Every structure is written in C-alpha cells, then in structure tokens.
C-alpha cells in the first residue's frame, strides 16, 4: 500500500522525514517530495507550502506522479472545541471550506459551486486513526469537523461568525479542504489529522510560534501510529 502524506510546513513533516528509511527526494515546482519507507509502508512525504492553492498543486502532483492508494494530511490547526488543549488531535469526520460563499446560487455556506458541501474522509483511514489513538499516551484525540480557509484565525469577531456558520467545527486550518477536494476529484481516499497549535483567539500568533513544533510532532506521531494500523 502506497500512502501520500502532506504537511504544509517543515515542523509538520520533519519528524516523518527523519523517521523514514531509504528516503529519496525530488522537487517539482518548488515542492519537495520525499519517497521511502515508514512504519513498514511505502510513503511519499510532501511539504506543500501554506494555503489552499499550494496544497492543491502539491496534491495534484503527488497523485499524478506517485499514484498513492490514499492521502493523509497532517499538521497543525487552531482549536475550536472547548474540551481540547494545545497538542491534542482532531481526526476529520468531515472537511469543509469556511471562506467560500456562493449561497446566492442556492449552495450551502462553505460549499464551492459544483462540489459537495462537505468532503468525507475514508472510513478505513478514520478507523485506523481511532485505533492509533491508544498508542499516543496522554494526548487526546477526537473526531470532528475541520474547516479550511486562506486566513490565520485570531480575531474573536471572525471566530464568532465562523462558529455561527459551522457550530460543530472542532478545528480550522489552511490546507485540508483543498487537499480533500483534489482527492474527491481524483477519487483518492483521504483523511485529515491535525494537532492543535493554538485556540484561534487573540493569543494565537504567540501560541502558534511557541507550539508549532509540538503540534507538528504530535500529528506526525499520530500519522506513524495510523500507518502501523494499515
């Protein structure tokens, strides 16, 4: 089984690359793809860059060049669930865009025209992630809605609006829905796994800088544990 793994930033993929056996690196359009073995599986780890456009480019290149059987998106996120702390993990139950609005044409808020309102992760990948939670010790993990947009969220007014639009949102980030949409187009199974680096509030810029390495490491450990379940 060949698995593609996508993270936006170096701290989000560093532990994965360091843990790989026989890594081989290729760069296409400024995006690095590292192929090798991880947890007994053939993997391609990709550092996409930040945001929905670069994530879409990276996902398309990954699928076209390497033909993975499934894709895992890993990394950090801002937390919206009251019972989660920095470092805890959200496994996607569904993924949506929070910054898309074509409701004038009868679509749901967050739904791009001619696309589903929500992108649903692969049930087998989610089940493997659930089993992997037990190996993480004291790190808490839940399933929940993950929303994506091209903004770093730290404004309480914007947070309030987002929760009005998506009241069950557990986390927000900047790549997941774009990756999920590309996977949907190519019919490739996916799951998004994110560790919280901040709580999407006024302290988020400080928290993010302080905790991004911790969040990236926790998310990477979760990915490795998931691979061991496949």
Swiss-Prot record:
Pathway: Amino-acid biosynthesis; L-methionine biosynthesis via salvage pathway; S-methyl-5-thio-alpha-D-ribose 1-phosphate from S-methyl-5'-thioadenosine (hydrolase route): step 1/2
Family affiliation: Belongs to the PNP/UDP phosphorylase family. MtnN subfamily.
Record field: transmembrane: none
Catalytically driven reaction(s): S-adenosyl-L-homocysteine + H2O = S-(5-deoxy-D-ribos-5-yl)-L-homocysteine + adenine; S-methyl-5'-thioadenosine + H2O = 5-(methylsulfanyl)-D-ribose + adenine; 5'-deoxyadenosine + H2O = 5-deoxy-D-ribose + adenine
Protein source organism: Shewanella pealeana (strain ATCC 700345 / ANG-SQ1)
InterPro entries reported for this sequence: MTA_SAH_Nsdase, Nucleoside_phosphorylase_d, Nucleoside_phosphorylase_sf
CDD domains: MTAN
Superkingdom: Bacteria
Residues that hold substrate according to the record: 78, 153, 174-175
The protein's name: 5'-methylthioadenosine/S-adenosylhomocysteine nucleosidase
GO BP annotations, alphabetical order: L-methionine salvage from methylthioadenosine; L-methionine salvage from S-adenosylmethionine; nucleoside catabolic process
Gene Ontology cellular component annotations, sorted alphabetically: cytosol
Entry-linked Gene3D superfamilies: Nucleoside phosphorylase domain
């Amino acid at each position: 089984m060949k698995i593609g793994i996508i993270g936006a930033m170096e701290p989000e993929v560093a532990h994965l690359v360091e843990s790989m056996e026989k890594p081989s690196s290729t760069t296409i359009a400024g995006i690095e793809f590292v192929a090798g073995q991880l947890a007994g599986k053939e993997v391609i780890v990709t550092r996409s860059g930040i945001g929905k456009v670069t994530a879409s480019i990276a996902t398309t290149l990954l699928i076209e060049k390497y033909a993975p059987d499934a894709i895992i998106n890993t990394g950090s996120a801002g937390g919206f669930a009251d019972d989660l702390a920095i470092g805890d993990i959200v496994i996607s139950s569904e993924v949506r865009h929070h910054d898309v609005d074509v409701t004038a044409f009868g679509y749901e808020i967050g739904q791009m025209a001619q696309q589903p309102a929500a992108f649903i992760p692969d049930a087998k990948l989610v089940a493997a992630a659930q089993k992997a939670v037990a190996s993480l010790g004291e790190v808490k993990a839940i399933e929940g809605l993950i929303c994506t947009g091209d903004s770093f969220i730290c404004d309480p007014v914007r947070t309030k609006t987002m929760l009005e639009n998506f009241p069950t949102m557990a986390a927000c980030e900047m790549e997941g829905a774009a990756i999920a949409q590309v996977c949907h187009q190519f019919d490739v199974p996916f799951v998004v796994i994110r560790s919280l680096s901040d709580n999407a509030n006024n302290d988020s810029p400080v928290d993010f800088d302080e905790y991004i390495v911790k969040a990236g490491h926790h998310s990477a450990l979760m990915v490795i544990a998931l691979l061991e379940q496949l």
